[in-house]
């Protein structure tokens, strides 16, 4: 939970406070490399999350994909992209630890298994947990009217003027996140 909530945000904070203000030419020079790494992170993290049978690994791989979108926003060199990256980082800092808590602390303590297929029918036995898990999964998916959606939209819209291909490849995270969340 600490990794998803805090440690991943240290890199974002470091890029915002140190790298972009002190080395703006280097950021613009290496932005194609960073954008490529962000797209690879989005696609690889999402496809790996689709194949997971372990709930905690699924949440971890979704975090990798979301941080790829944050990198796309940070290195878009636009105000909209950077604002979207900040918003997505904050939203991810609330949603991802909540999912880790629900999977690790609540379900694993009761069933001693993290295999997804063993969790069928939990709505009958744990209705409050199911409602909370549904809420945070919908937020993690980036559905409209959630902060994750606004952050993803701003990040990808910030990348679009500079590099439409990267923005479209990054937008695959929207479809793939729906696939692994369902």
Q: What residues fall within each predicted segment?
A:
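Hydrophobic transmembrane alpha-helices and their helix-loop junctions in integral membrane proteins
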Residues: 1-153, 157-182
